[in-house]
Amino acid sequence: MDKPKRLFLKSKRSFRRRLPPIGSGDRIDYRNMSLISRFISEQGKILSRRVNRLTLKQQRLITIAIKQARILSSLPFLNNEKQFERAESTPRTPGPRTRNK
């Protein structure tokens, strides 16, 4: 009742490390809007560190820069463009009105 030893061989795939989203020459600053806007969602929320693929220190600096830009009115706190778009209105059909007394 000896089970034969099975060899599990992993296929060797070439692992290619992704480039960091912030280069060494990029300055994390509240005035650098092209850099900051990459780390904000469509709704205006700050994306998480896991989504951004940043280090802890970089994420902290990005968060501080975004908050400074919001306070100085360079960035909106919320981006609710959908709220102001008017949906197609459905025509109202006037029906018989009854009043309860």
UniProtKB/Swiss-Prot annotation:
One Pfam match: Ribosomal_S18
Compartment(s) of residence: Plastid, Chloroplast
Lineage top rank: taxon: Eukaryota
One of the record's GO molecular function terms: small ribosomal subunit rRNA binding
Keyword Plastid: yes
Main location per the UniProt record: plastid
GO terms under biological process: translation
UniProt key word Chloroplast: yes
InterPro entries on file: Ribosomal_bS18 (IPR001648), Ribosomal_bS18_CS (IPR018275), Ribosomal_bS18_sf (IPR036870)
A single Gene Ontology CC term: mitochondrial small ribosomal subunit
Region feature Disordered, mapped onto this chain: 82-101
Family: Belongs to the bacterial ribosomal protein bS18 family.
PANTHER family according to UniProt: 30S RIBOSOMAL PROTEIN S18, SMALL RIBOSOMAL SUBUNIT PROTEIN BS18M
Quaternary structure and interacting proteins, as annotated: Part of the 30S ribosomal subunit.
Listed name of the protein: Small ribosomal subunit protein bS18c
Lineage of the organism: Eukaryota, Viridiplantae, Streptophyta, Embryophyta, Tracheophyta
Gene responsible for this protein: rps18
